Design a protein with these regions (language model features):
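Active-site anion/phosphate-binding pocket segments in diverse small-molecule metabolic enzymes
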Residues: 2-5, 9-20, 24, 75, ...
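Active-site phosphate/pyrophosphate- and oxyanion-stabilizing loops and adjacent acidic/basic residues
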Residues: 28, 156, 362
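Conserved PLP-enzyme active-site core in the AAT-like
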Residues: 33
Length: 378
């Protein structure tokens, strides 16, 4: 469960600070690079990559985005319960058990030729509604979707379900985030093949979407009429191989405070397994945050944090709820610690953490689930 109550700030020594102004800046920059005929959906799956789906969506709608995209039905339901009436697309295939809910909350769900359609038809009919769906096309990601050569047959099958309406179609590019766009362009060629079998493509309002963050940045031919920016909403670029790097900001800061300072004597070990041994007498400090909060254990003896605008090394193994760092004479109990983001002139970017633990910044931000959030405007 994630928390977004201002009161939590007064109860927790560790929290995530989300800068609304930085979020708004990114949303505005991305929207400004796209022509007016290309709509933007804000990808707010995984609670907006840890930034808070509802707050991100509120700002996105103010900045000209027309819809939300989430991974699962329950994420779409959460947006509806928070009062959002804009179109909400889900990106993952729904199960038959989710049919009633998808219809009830007016979600636009993906269906391909592997989905059992009868439960969705029955749910829509029983509720007196038309279920809007969009068709995922597998152009090479090999995750979900109908293959281009099977589209015509699938469309014929869909005619048997009068309470299911095709709202649009989409595909996902697997290698648009590298310099060589050959594979991405081949995927778009396959998408065009699939589109050629869809007479609906000529209808007003029919959604055609292929541009993920990498496509938004580097491939105007992928924009069609709906762009799906995801990671770039939150600061990081898809990779360091992008041809275009925009002026994006990082809204997220992970903050904690020093709870303990001590002197570690020469020859003494610290933490589980004693993986760090002091070569001389030294001051160390303890921070009440650990891998249960989503801070990677692989940063043990490798990562850094910021205290008083200076970098301090993580020493010993990161524990479930606590971790230890080197501490200079100026480090005191109660001092602010920044584990992700800016403090003074120093910054720890999610890309830095991702490089150390051999992952991507998406996972770094999405994994911080236990820590409460607060919002600021700066």
């Amino acid at each position: 469960m994630l928390f977004y109550l201002e009161e939590v700030f007064h109860m927790s020594v560790s929290y995530i600070e989300i800068n609304r102004s930085a979020l708004r800046h990114n949303l505005r920059v991305i929207r400004s690079h796209l022509p007016a005929h290309v709509d933007c959906t804000a990808v707010v799956k995984a609670d907006a990559y840890g930034h808070g789906a509802s707050e991100t969506m509120r700002i996105a709608l103010e900045e000209g985005y027309n819809s939300a995209a989430v991974a699962r039905v329950e994420e779409g339901v959460a947006l509806r319960k928070d009062g959002f009436t804009c179109p909400v697309f889900t990106l993952g295939l729904p199960l038959p058990e989710e049919a009633e809910t998808a219809v009830k909350y007016d979600l636009i769900v993906p269906v391909d030729d592997t989905v059992e359609l009868e439960p969705f038809e029955e749910a829509a009919e029983s509720q007196g509604k038309i279920l809007e769906v969009w068709l995922p096309i597998d152009t090479g990601m090999n995750r979900i979707g109908t293959h281009p050569e099977d589209v015509e047959g699938f469309l014929e099958k869909l005619k048997k379900y009068p309470h299911i309406h095709i709202h649009g179609t989409f595909t996902h590019m697997a290698k648009a985030d590298i310099h060589d766009k050959t594979t991405a362009r081949k995927q778009l060629e396959k998408f065009e093949e699939a589109l050629s079998h869809m007479p609906q493509r000529l209808e007003k309002g029919f959604i055609i979407s292929a541009a993920n963050s990498a496509g938004v940045l580097d491939m105007p031919e992928s924009w069609y009429n709906l762009a799906r920016p995801g990671i770039i909403l939150y600061g990081p670029h898809p990779s360091d191989e992008m041809d275009n790097m925009w002026d994006l900001e990082y809204p997220m800061r992970l903050i904690s405070h020093i709870t303990h300072v001590q002197v570690l004597r020469k020859g003494e070990a610290i933490g589980y397994g004693g993986t760090y041994v002091a070569e001389e007498d030294m001051r160390t400090a303890t921070i009440p945050i650990g891998y249960a909060d989503g801070f990677h254990r692989a940063l043990s003896n490798k990562g850094s944090v910021l205290v008083n605008g200076k970098r301090h090394r993580i020493i010993g193994r990161i524990c479930m709820d606590q971790m230890m760092i080197t501490a200079g004479d100026d480090v005191q109990v109660g001092d602010e610690v920044v584990l992700l983001g800016r403090q003074g002139d120093e910054v720890i970017y999610p890309e830095e953490i991702a490089a150390i633990v051999n992952t991507i910044p998406h996972e770094v931000m999405c994994g911080l689930k236990r820590v409460p959030r607060i919002y600021v405007d700066e």
